[in-house]
Amino acid sequence: MDLKNIKIEDPFWGHMQELVTDVVIPFQEDVLNDRQPGVEKSHAIENFKIAAGLSQGEFYGMVFQDSDVAKWLEGVAYSLIIKPDAALEKRADDIIDIIAAAQQPDGYLNTYFTIKEPEHRWQNLLECHELYCAGHMMEAAVAYYEATGKDKLLKVMEGMAGHIIDRFGPDKLPGIPGHQEVEIGLMRMYHATGNEAYKKQARYFLEERGKNPAFFAEEAAKRDWNHFGMVPKDIKYNQSHATIYEQEEAVGHSVRAVYMYTAMADLAATEHDEKLFAACERLWNNMTEKKMYITGGIGSTVEGEAFTKEYELPNDMAYAETCASIGLVFFAKQMLKMSKNGKYADAMERELYNGIISGMQLDGKRFFYVNPLEVNPGVSGEIFGYKHVIPERPGWYACACCPPNLVRMVTSLGRYAWDEDDDVIYSHLFIGQEARLKKADIKVVSEYPWKGHVSYSITPKTGDEFAVAIHIPGYLKSFEVTLNGMRLKENSETKADVFYSYRDGYIYIKNKWHDNDVIEISFNMDIRVIYANTKVREDIGCAALQRGPVVYAFEGVDNDDDVQSLMIDVSRLNEAQIETEAEGILKGAVLLDIPAVRLEGSDALYSEKPPRQKSVIARAIPYYMWGNRGLNQMRVWMHTI
């Protein structure tokens, strides 16, 4: 889907995109250039200048520091489509010139090894992220070419891709990435250029993984140095314990996993590979049905930033990395290429309205790496086992993978909204926009996620009959569909000429369309009480609240600085009040006032007297907005009466 043909015009996401283009991208540019006071030093641009011989100094930062620049450039490419900016484009061009100058004569591109350890190139695939950085720069190169028509970075990365292909593969040196990502980059290079060698190399890296589970241990034995001190025998950490066709459970580092799954699904759809798609489907089902938080977060433990056991989803120790949630959206969209099943669009929606945008402060200048479902100041971020659960968003990180990843996700949102084949236009998300598609131009007007009304105005480009398929969120028990004001019935209920059919989470309306035909979908936005599977021991006796796609959280600032002693009364949910915030940092959001009781006990540590129950009204805010009003308790899963 060409982003130039999609213009987001949505009250919710339009604001998010404006925040990213006007605030976040300039802020991150300053950080990458070490011009932003009070945040972690980046040095990422300076590393490229040093590698290019344009500056003197030493490498600084993580071994994968180059990827911060790549993801920022990719986000810039998308932002130039949303909001052309000649000055920003010139600065991006200048950075690309520096990157090109840092490339070595053999095509190799990596500032860490060029500056610091040139003699160690390609000796430590386990730890050193050379292929990972290459993959992100490939994605940036394709995005920038598609946005601007400029191919300088694309040519640089074609040189790096050629270098990689010459080195790794059958009858060459064996090798797999220690952190998957180059597979995604190679597939994007293939889609942009049509060069079959890129697709072939992506398949090699995917299918080589797990063939020799001892690969990284054997690699480590050949060298007398390490970088992080990773344990090469921890083969589940990087999913090298089995081939991609043998893996049935989502294990290991969650971002590594979903990046690999994304490339697998892309390759499966591109080559109509049913065996590979079946492998993707097994992993998808395990991950989303047994290892995903209600907010969409995946990877529940700080140990290895990884998946753990099925149903092991602690709230106050959750990891749920922002990058992992973004990666799940990448995976979902690739799965939709091959199977138009609403469960993939449901997952995208869950992530987009919850576990992704919770990673960014509402002012666009502070970011979460970790997205917990419960926070307790004094414990969270302070004591052993909880130090990763930072109760307030920092400005930047030494390992700053998430902020630029969030930028490229929000600015490329249009890529995830549509698909189109010979007979059907598919709408996956209720996002207001203007879309110029092959068969029709469609204007979507949406009040989502706060109100249940979406309209599609269709201007066909052909007199042929075709279908418009619109995803209906899986939580909806009922909805109404009209065409030009006339209510449509499902095909099983009517003999009318125009009707809708429902299949796998989508309604299909087949018609010979006319200018200004309007489909409208209306539905109630009820507060829903959600209960976890009883195998999720952390959530037994608790419930969460959801309205539309938005998961809600309770913060101390709204609830006498104590959410832990609250119990919500789900039997009185019909008394709940829905309020749209009129001012302040939460302006425009729908807040919930819920009947509840507060438990009040004595000062004794233990007592035979039960706590007193005091009736109160508890306020809940959208989960993604938590942490914007100072240091607070926060909780998603609440005890119930």
Predicted segments, located by residue:
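Low-complexity, Ser/Thr/Pro/Gly-enriched N-terminal "stalk/linker" regions
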Residues: 1-68, 93-113
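C-terminal beta-rich recognition modules with glycine/proline-rich loops and embedded aromatic residues
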Residues: 5, 11, 280, 346-354, ...
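Well-ordered alpha-helical scaffold segments within catalytic/enzyme domains
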Residues: 13, 73-86, 135-150, 183-195, ...
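Carbohydrate-binding/catalytic loop surfaces
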Residues: 42-61, 110-129, 180-192, 219-253, ...
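Extended ligand-binding groove/face enriched in aromatic
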Residues: 50-64, 70, 79-177, 184-240
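Catalytic cores of eukaryotic secretory-pathway lumenal/extracellular enzymes that build
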Residues: 104, 139, 143, 157-164, ...
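Beta-strand-rich binding/interaction modules
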Residues: 463-486
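Short, surface-exposed beta-strand/beta-hairpin micro-motifs centered on an aromatic residue
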Residues: 506-508
